[in-house]
Amino acid sequence: MKKKKNILKKLFCLVLAGVLTAALFTGCGSPAGDDSGDTKKEDGADKTAGSGDDKKITVGVNPVPHADILENVVKDVLAKDGWELEVVVFQDYVLPNTSLESGELDANYFQTLGYMNQQNEDAGLHLAAAAGVHIEPMGIYSQKYSSIEEIPDGAEIGIPNDPDNAERGLQLLVQKGFLNSIGDYGRDENYTADSLSNDKEANPHGYKITPLEAANLPLSLPDLDAAAINGNYALGADLPSNYPALEIEEFDDETAVRRTNFIVVRQGEEESEKTQALIKAVQSDEVKQYIEDTYKGSVIASFIEEE
């Protein structure tokens, strides 16, 4: 929409070139009307050049629950204040950040602070958390058993295979009494899931710990006795409706912050008009009620304001 308006603006300038003054013509071609809509900071970060007349907010998201929350609630809340919301859905975790960095998005909404900080460091991005919205608790799911007490010694339990979520899944198993500890998992590269499976001190019930791609855990659930599954993948597979979690994560103040999904913007734009309008909408009573009514504990509101 912005590009279309800028093209029309330039055409308008060309048509009137013969009658307008040189100064007015130069004004039509000023940087503020550039099709890119952004200029580069000296430190390499992108800075959106949009003015107060731009009432459109473009946000990159993952499908569930992020897109649902924005499309079903936030869009209407923003409209009441005169804002238009465009939701751009991504299937991965990389493009929402690079698209935000390049100025194609005004914000994104899919990630935790830890992931954002890692991407800033590893990929040289310049992103900042603006406000927390929700937590997707990891849960212990099973198609074979209806309570954790039914799960027998030696059962096979799946966990995600990426480092952060693998440790998160194991800590959930500790929290719910399956394991005494995670042993040296994550601290000693020679200590594997097999090591933990055979560690009688950490794993007195002899559970077989099986790391799998996080997105594949719901598909693998029929072949496992149980699995620790991330909330977004559980929702995507409709597990909470068909096979409700036997247990879900509990959070103290520190872990709640670490597990919260944040609205993220480019550094320096945390206080912009667009960012503040978006924060107001995503942290509204309407969003909180929608989360409670729709997800019934598989998503939890976590309205954190970044300082």
Model-derived features: positions:
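Short, low-complexity disordered leader/linker segments with a strong preference
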Residues: 1-56, 304-307
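Short helices/loops that flank or line small-molecule/ion binding pockets
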Residues: 76, 94-106, 121, 171-172, ...
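A bilobed periplasmic-binding-protein/Venus flytrap-type ligand-binding module shared by bacterial periplasmic
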Residues: 137-149, 258-273, 277
